[in-house]
Structure formats: structure tokens, C-alpha cells
Amino acid sequence: MKNILKIWTAALIFIFAASCSKNSDTGISLSLKGTTTFPAFKKGATIEGFTFSEALLGIKEIEIKKEDEMMDDGDMDFDYDGSYIVDLLLGKSTPALGFSEFLPGTYNKFESKTASVLDGGKSLSVKGIYTDAAGTAYSFDVSTTSKIKFEFESDTAFVLTEGTVLDMLINLNLPMLFEGVDFSKATANGSGIIVINDLTNSAILTKIMSNIDQIANMEDEHESEHD
């Protein structure tokens, strides 16, 4: 039987499922995935009309830190180092994030840094179609080469015990990247696609990056009981 704990913000949902390992392994198996739905307590704040065809994130470092870490002490950090291309639509990464050994303890802080490892030196690439309430469809292609740091700290920590492997799934709400974006004010290219990057429709990218900044620095708003 698995013990399941959910910790979420409006944009990020952390789901932990702990089960006893059949061997002596102690650690975390990590995956990231995009989502287009909100937690139940945010149902009144939906952002509808999005269909995504691509959502890629370049990652170079992920750190999960102990609750009692008072200083930036490398001995207290347990991380995934390397270059990862995360497909948020499929919930898979190349290479796979998979399992990493951690010391038993109480953890409550997550940090991640993006890297420009996607094609064209991008750190984020999101493509799709947005259809507004009037039925007008806008094809978009959003990308940036900027480095993004995600930080999340929760009052509700999770405990990793000896001989336990913790399955950790992080869901990122993709429509929230576009909150407050008016596609009707964007300029489309010759193919009718709204390209949004550091050089084209840059004012819209500034708004999207502002949304990302808010997403990237959040504390939990709600936590569920163990199921």
C-alpha cells in the first residue's frame, strides 16, 4: 500500500507516493509533467481554450533539501545534476530523471534551474493553439533562452525513511503561463503563427516571464491528508 501526500499551489502540484522498497534502496524517483487543469480549490480560476502540441523544458539541476537545512550546505543537498530535456506533455525526460539515492530525513524544499539545452539554445519551448470565447483561434510558439529558477518551500514536509522509495510527481499548470496575455494584440508571422520570443512579440514574452516568476517562487496554499 502506498501513502499519498499532495502539496499544491495554484500552478504547481507535488504528489508523493511512498512505498517500501524490496531492497535496501532509500531515495526519490522523480518525474515532471504539464497539466491543464486546476486543483479543486481553484476551479473558479480556470483558464480555458488551450490545446498544447509541445511543452519542453531544459533542466540542468534539481535540488531537494532537508527541512533542518539552515545554511547553503552542500552536504545537506540531494540533487539531480546534468542536462535534461523534459517533455511536459508526456511526463518524460531525456535522459530519464528516475531514481536518486537520498539520506533518510525530513524534506520540504525544492529548487530547479533551467538550462539552454533545447534546439536553438532555448530553455523553454511551448507551442499550441488558443481559442478565445468568440471562437477565434491563435496558433502560438513561445520560447526563451533565459534561465529560470523554480523554488518551492512547504510547511508540510515529507519524511523519507530508511528502505523507502518515494515517487515524486511535479505537475506544472501550463495555461497559467498565459494568464493575462491578449493574443489579439500579438503580431503573427507569414504562416499565421504568433511567435513569442526574446526578439518577436517581446512585450508578451515579458508578461509570460512575469507569470513564470510568480509560479517559480511559491509557498504551498493547501495540503491534503494522507490517503
Q: Which residue stretches match the model-derived regions?
A:
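Short, linear, compositionally biased motifs with a strong N-terminal bias
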Residues: 11-14
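C-terminal motif of bacterial Sec signal peptides marking the signal peptidase cleavage site
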Residues: 16-19
